[in-house]
């Protein structure tokens, strides 16, 4: 995934466009649900949607709508590619927004290894990270990685910050 994200924009656009065109031709695909923050941040899906005629929804569509509602947000994502794309989207939608973000690839790897959410949240000290975010003025925590709903309920019980998870709003946008 990281190798793809750091490849040239032309290579990424060509690969994604070919994949989506194949889905259209083979399966009659009319919509695409891109459930990956770092991929969404490394490829501009607007031109691809126009070229293919597909309705494409990404987590960034949700962040674009959320940004004007806040003055300060905390973002946790899988890696710097993910945080960069999320930050670019949020700040384009609300240039006055204060952002603090963290890439947490070790958390992603723990999820993929099957570590229980309770242990993962404690071992990676996520409540302490969120307490710091709150202490510096964050109004909410953005789950900027689609792996992170795995521990969302456990973390929510241990922090005061509201958690923003784009998944449900993405489904609504896809059906709109």
Give, region by region, the residue ranges found by the protein language model.
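Non-catalytic structural scaffold of enzyme domains
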Residues: 1-176
């Amino acid at each position: 995934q990281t190798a793809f994200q750091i490849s040239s924009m032309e290579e990424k656009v060509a690969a994604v466009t070919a994949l989506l065109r194949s889905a259209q031709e083979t399966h009659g695909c009319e919509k695409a649900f891109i459930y990956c923050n770092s991929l969404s941040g490394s490829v501009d899906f607007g031109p691809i949607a126009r070229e293919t005629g597909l309705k494409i929804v990404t987590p960034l569509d949700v962040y674009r709508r959320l940004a004007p509602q806040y003055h300060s947000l905390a973002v946790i994502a899988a890696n710097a590619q993910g945080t960069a794309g999320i930050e670019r989207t949020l700040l384009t939608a609300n240039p006055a927004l204060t952002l603090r973000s963290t890439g947490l690839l070790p958390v992603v790897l723990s999820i993929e290894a099957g570590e229980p959410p309770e242990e993962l949240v404690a071992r990676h000290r996520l409540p302490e990270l969120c307490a710091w975010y709150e202490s510096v003025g964050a109004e909410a925590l953005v789950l900027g990685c689609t792996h992170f709903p795995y521990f969302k309920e456990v973390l929510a019980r241990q922090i005061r910050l509201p958690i923003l998870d784009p998944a449900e709003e993405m489904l609504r946008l896809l059906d709109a």
